[in-house]
C-alpha cells in the first residue's frame, strides 16, 4: 500500500496522470440527469492494481446526490491508468487513492488526491 503522500518522483508522475485522466473523463462526460448537469462534491477511495485496472471504488463522503455519486464512480471505473513501472511494482501490487471530486459550473471536474478522506 502506497499513499499519494509518497514523495518519490515515480509515484508523483503516476498520481498526476491518474488525476488528469479522471478530470479529463469527468469534464468530457459531465454527469447529467434529465438533460441537466449535476453539481457537487464527494470523496472517493479508489484502489488501482499494478496493471492500472480499477479494483474498487468507495464513496466515503457523499455529495448528497446518489446519482452524482454513482456517476462519479462510473467515470473512474471506465478508466485504465497504465501499468506500474518497475520501481512501483517492486514496492506495491496496488495503490489506494483518496480523491476529492468537485463538479463545478465553472471548471468542470476538479480532483484533489490525498492520503486521508
PLM regions: where:
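Intrinsic disorder
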Residues: 5, 9-13
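Surface-exposed patches in mature extracellular/periplasmic domains of secreted proteins
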Residues: 30-35, 87
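A short acidic/small-residue loop/turn micro-motif
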Residues: 61-67
